[in-house]
């Protein structure tokens, strides 16, 4: 599901691009890569075009506006949570969170107010089913997510969905 970075290394503390995430989540769900040409900044010739196309057409990833995906952009913790929550829904998990449950779940973290409004419910869902670790003191929603964190999130999601 997750390829190394060459020469037998995984580089767990390296950040991840949006393109890398689209590839990993598509492979994790066993979806076939198919370029949909949905974004003007994703050339068909790039290795990630099919993964981004499939992840987008499956409702897992969105663009960043103006028909762009920003494939080389670094993915943040709140973006990853939103995308993993969408993938979890495809796996059959109930990702619905009402406003009160969302606030209760996020309020335990010192920086919960810094989570973007669009990311609050998916972030709360990820914490509620232990896709994300509740023992952290802060969410750090705009911090770049690390390869090791994505690997753990996807493992936890697939486990919660009883797919592994």
Language-model features: locations:
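Feature responds to low-complexity, polar/acidic, surface-exposed segments characteristic
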Residues: 3-22, 26-51, 57-78, 86-119, ...
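Alpha-helix C-terminal capping/helix-coil junction sites
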Residues: 56-57, 127
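IQ-motif-like calmodulin-binding regions
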Residues: 81
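Preference for long, well-ordered alpha-helical segments
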Residues: 148-151
């Amino acid at each position: 599901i997750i390829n190394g970075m060459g020469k037998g290394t995984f580089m767990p503390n390296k950040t991840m691009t949006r393109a890398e995430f689209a590839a990993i989540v598509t492979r994790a769900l066993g979806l076939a890569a198919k370029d949909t040409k949905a974004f003007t900044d994703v050339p068909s010739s790039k290795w990630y075009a099919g993964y981004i196309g499939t992840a987008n057409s499956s409702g897992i990833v969105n663009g960043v506006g103006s028909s762009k995906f920003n494939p080389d952009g670094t993915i943040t913790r709140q973006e990853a949570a939103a995308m993993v929550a969408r993938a979890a829904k495809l796996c059959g998990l109930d990702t619905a969170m009402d406003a009160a449950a969302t606030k209760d779940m996020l309020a335990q973290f010192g920086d919960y107010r810094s989570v973007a409004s669009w990311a609050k419910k998916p972030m709360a869902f990820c914490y509620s089913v232990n896709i994300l670790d509740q023992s952290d003191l802060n969410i750090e929603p705009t911090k770049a997510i690390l390869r090791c964190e994505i690997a753990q999130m996807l493992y936890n999601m697939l486990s919660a969905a009883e797919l592994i």
